[in-house]
Curated annotation (Swiss-Prot):
Region of interest (Disordered), ranges: 15-65, 84-149, 216-280, 379-482, 497-531, 616-642, 672-748, 826-855
Entry's localization field: Nucleus
Every HTH myb-type domain range: 272-327, 328-378
Residues within the DNA-binding region(s): 300-323, 351-374
Chain intervals with Acidic residues compositional bias: 390-401
Main localization (coarse): nucleus
GO annotation, cellular component aspect: nucleus
Composition-biased stretches (Basic residues): 47-56, 127-139
Protein name: Myb-like protein Q
PANTHER family for this protein: MYB TRANSCRIPTION FACTOR 42 (PTHR47999:SF124), TRANSCRIPTION FACTOR MYB8-RELATED-RELATED (PTHR47999)
SMART domains per the UniProt record, alphabetical: SANT (SM00717)
Length: 909
């Protein structure tokens, strides 16, 4: 099988055989030619280096880095050769197509096989000779550098070791090419008009594409040659690639390889051969958006410097055509199609001017939409229309393919002859002599191997004669290999696309097309028909717009007339709609109307006047009702205020009475304390007389207190009855009055003290000293004859532990001998006077038991009162020697204040 690879203006067919000696000779010959050409270019660059001596230190550092890189490359090449040797078989033949190795940016590459003209090489030789005389030292250093930087040094040494021959390898290539054998025909034709490969912006990207291509056959030593690999033709920087994300798969398997190919090894900046023409990746888009947000959509050169492999023009077009937020990505509407068709009829292919008519649609998108869909709708000839002037040649990035221009797919066919033939368009005498089939290059002629060999150096011509013998000896082996195999299949190469720089005719044609008039006379008929159809569509659109304007004007006029009529109409018709009366008012109005209808009819003259005044009468009636309601509301408020004032007066009166009662009570207390003090004084001197007169005084005092209490209770009942009558009257008069004030200000309860609240009432089982609702508790006397005691912190004291001590204190207080008794012994001897007094007090309390709170008294006063009450009550009941007081065990009836003063009476006295 044979494979063909081609890029730009170069075409190459590579054939291999099992004989590895011929392949190695070709590689070595090509290496020598490239080294000679590279030496010439190095000498030219050496003049600039001699002027800048201060850059030598930097170059040394760079050389060290490059040495390391080349060592890595040599190791990789050795590994590839080992794999190739393992894959080779003795009886099989295979071909492969691998791009040349990547060279450094310091030494620009030259066309293969010395394709430059002889004049150029002679000038280079003269310059080289002149530089050898003046700058011999610098040439030696530079030659050493070139030996280090040469990408094929490792492979050359490897081939010499494999061959085991000490003869120069540069003589092998010409012998192989000059052989008259028709069996093997390596074909390589290069145009003399091509620029050096270093000027080609798509070189490295294509090389990496071929390097990453997966082929079935293993690589051969031909792949080591920097000149026999497929290389791309130079492209103009103005030609843009396809930026659409929906393109085919990327030709780079690894992103690092892509960036290494696009950046130079010296400064890390994008070089001219490192411009990427492939589709944009997501990483590049994200980086571009970030840089535009920082720098703004202006400084495209600085933005492109931060994106390897991209120039400012590519960044600008990528932003404005795809990434800008102003770009619309929605489907095209029929309105937009009409605008484009109409604008194209008048302006032609001026896409930038047309894009100004559509918001969010860039010129490139409009152009693509025109070429893809609108031309089919119109039915015009796309070829004739595309011949017109296109003012937006720079915006055709989406119309082109994402990769560099390559040939169309190769079609293979079988031939009956043993030799290979190709279809050609032009032939020359030189190609017939060398038995090399010519290839059709656009605007260029083919050159033979004789012309190429004449332009080489004198040293190469001598070596070529020596290599002819080797090629003749090896021709027999190749003939046998080809005859044994089946008829070979030759590639049929069809040129699909050419680059602008590969042929001068394209560039001249392009400049000529730019100078053309947009509308040529050849296409005038077709354009006239298109213009007529477009004019008709424009007229229809204009008519529709006029009709719409007329309809809008009519609607505006109608609205104005309606507005004027509404202003002229009386207010009567609008009032029921503007403000509706409440339902009660509407019912009253209906009743009022029925009442007037029942009345006898008036003359026609009067009836005419009544109708327009009917609404005014309703309003007047409604106003009267509102006024009446307001008056009622004011009266109710006035009554409420009066009631509130009366309540306040009553409260003040009650407070005054309460204060008077407290004053009287305090006076009585003082008087009673004085009497008690006198009695104590008398008891010390005359204890027997005090015991006789004391019960009578207590009875007289209790009667006086009961009478005052009954009077006060009667007054309070009368006041409560008066308040109830007033509240009943107010509820009858005002059923719908506001009760918020009375609820928010309730009458506070008054604390009215009563005599029995302090002295208590005796029952059959207990005797209350200070009964109350929540604040005070009861003190009872039970049959167990035990006191319930509390300390200063109101903690209960165990009475059984201090029973003997208490009795001893009572005996000391009464100056009587102490007779200890058992706590369970019950004393049944009681006086009849105490029972009678208790019964009387109980009757009074039961009759007057109304939940009236007690007056607020301090703990000291209550303690002293209870002490005296207990003392007097104790003297009235039984003798101290025979009975002991008892206290109930009910915790709810305990006294919540300190009664320790009961037992400290002798000390105070």
């Amino acid at each position: 099988m044979l494979y063909c690879g081609s890029t730009g203006g170069h075409y190459m067919i590579m054939t291999t055989n099992n004989n590895s000696n011929n392949n190695n000779n070709n590689n070595n010959n090509n290496n020598n030619n490239n080294n000679n050409n590279n030496n010439n270019n190095i000498n030219q660059n050496h003049q600039h280096q001699h002027q800048h001596h201060h850059h030598q230190q930097q170059q040394q550092q760079q050389q060290q880095q490059q040495q390391q890189q080349q060592q890595q490359q040599q190791q990789q090449q050795q590994q590839q050769q080992q794999q190739q040797q393992q894959n080779y078989g003795e009886s099989t033949t295979s071909t492969s197509m691998i791009p040349p190795s990547i060279t450094t940016s310091l030494t620009p590459l030259t066309p293969t096989l010395s394709s430059q003209p002889q004049n150029i090489q002679q000038q280079q030789q003269q310059q080289h000779h002149h530089q050898q005389q003046h700058h011999h030292h610098h040439q030696q250093t530079q030659q050493q550098q070139q030996q280090i930087l040469s990408p094929m040094m490792g492979s050359k040494r490897k081939l010499e070791e494999d061959m085991g021959v000490g003869q120069p390898t540069s003589n092998l290539t010409n012998e192989y090419l000059m052989s008259n054998n028709n069996s093997l025909k390596p074909i390589l034709v290069s145009s003399p008009l091509l620029t050096p490969l270093s000027a080609s912006p798509g070189l490295t990207s294509m090389q990496m594409a071929f390097a990453n291509a997966s082929l079935s056959a293993p690589s051969t030593p031909l792949s080591m040659s920097p000149s026999l690999g497929p290389c791309s033709a130079p492209m103009s920087p103005s030609k843009k690639s396809k930026n659409s994300r929906s393109s085919s798969k990327s030709k780079y398997q690894n992103s690092e390889e892509r960036w290494q190919s696009t950046t130079s090894k010296d400064n890390g900046k994008p070089s001219s051969p490192g411009i990427v023409k492939g589709p944009w990746k997501d990483e590049e888009d994200a980086k571009l958006v970030e840089l535009v947000n920082k720098c703004g959509p202006k400084e495209w050169s600085s933005i492109a410097a931060k994106i390897p492999g991209r120039i400012g023009k590519q960044c600008r077009e990528r932003w404005f055509n795809h990434l800008s937020p102003e770009v619309r990505k929605t489907n095209w509407t029929p309105e937009e199609d009409k605008i484009i068709i109409d604008a194209h009829a008048s302006l032609g292919n001026k896409w930038t001017a047309i894009s100004k008519m559509l918001d969010g649609r860039p010129a490139n998108a409009i152009k693509n939409h025109w070429n893809s869909t609108l031309l089919k709708k119109i039915g015009g000839d796309s070829k004739s229309l595309n011949k017109e002037k296109d003012d937006d040649d720079d915006d055709d990035e989406d119309a082109e393919d994402g990769s560099s221009p390559v040939l169309s797919p190769i079609s293979l066919y079988q031939s009956s002859s043993s030799t290979t033939t190709t279809t050609t368009t032009t032939t020359t005498n030189s190609s017939e002599k060398s038995n090399i089939p010519p290839f059709a290059l656009s605007g260029s002629t083919t050159t033979s191997t004789n012309n190429l060999n004449n332009s080489t150096n004198s040293t190469n011509s001598i070596n070529n004669n020596n290599n002819n013998n080797n090629n003749n000896n090896n021709s027999s082996n190749t003939n046998t290999a080809i005859t044994t195999n089946e008829p070979l299949v030759a590639p049929k190469i069809i040129r699909a696309q050419t680059t602008p720089n590969s042929s001068p005719s394209l560039s001249s044609k392009k400049t000529h097309d730019k100078q053309k008039v947009p509308q040529s006379p050849k296409n005038s008929k077709q354009q006239q028909t298109q213009q007529q159809t477009q004019q008709q569509t424009q007229q229809q659109l204009q008519q529709q717009q006029q009709q719409q304007q007329q309809q809008q004007q009519q609607q505006q006029q109608q609205q104005q007339q309606q507005h004027i009529q509404q202003q002229q109409m009386p207010v009567i018709s609008q009032q029921p709609h503007i403000q509706q009366l409440p339902i009660d008012q509407q019912i009253q109005n209906a009743q009022f109307q029925q009442f007037h209808l029942q009345q006898p009819s008036m003359p026609s003259s009067t009836s005419v006047n009544i109708i327009p005044n009917q609404s005014s009468m309703e309003q007047h009636h409604y106003q009267q009702q509102q006024q009446a309601q307001q008056q009622q509301h004011q009266q109710q408020q006035h009554q409420q205020q009066q009631q509130h004032q009366q309540q306040q007066q009553q409260q003040q009166y009650l407070m005054q009475q309460h204060q008077q009662y407290q004053q009287q009570y305090q006076l009585m207390q003082q008087h009673y304390q004085q009497q008690l003090s006198q009695q104590h004084h008398q008891q010390q001197h005359h204890p027997q007389q005090a015991q006789q007169h004391h019960p009578q005084q207590v009875q007289h005092h209790q009667q006086h207190i009961n009478t005052t209490h009954n009077q006060h209770q009667q007054q309070q009942q009368q006041q409560q009855q008066q308040q109830q009558q007033q509240t009943n009257n107010s509820q009858v008069n005002s059923n719908n009055t506001d009760t918020t004030f009375s609820n928010s200000h309730p009458i506070e309860p008054h604390e009215v003290p009563y005599y029995y609240d302090y002295w208590g009432s005796s029952t059959s089982g207990s005797q209350t000293l200070i009964p109350s609702d929540n604040t005070t508790n009861t003190y009872t006397i039970e049959n167990n004859n035990d006191f319930l005691l509390f300390d200063d912190n109101q903690h209960r004291i165990q009475p059984l532990q201090q029973h003997q001590h208490i009795k001893q204190e009572h005996a000391q207080m009464s100056h009587l001998p102490y007779h200890p008794t058992q706590p369970n012994n019950l004393n049944t001897t009681t006086t009849t006077t105490n029972n009678n007094n208790n019964n009387n007090n109980n009757n009074n309390n039961n009759n007057n038991n109304n939940n009236i709170p007690t007056p607020n008294m301090s703990a000291s006063t209550t303690g002293t009162i209870n002490h005296h009450i207990h003392q007097t009550h104790h003297h009235l009941t039984t003798p101290l020697s025979q009975s002991t007081p008892s206290v109930s065990t009910d915790q709810n009836n305990y006294i919540n204040y300190d009664i320790s003063s009961l037992f400290s009476l002798p000390n105070e006295i």
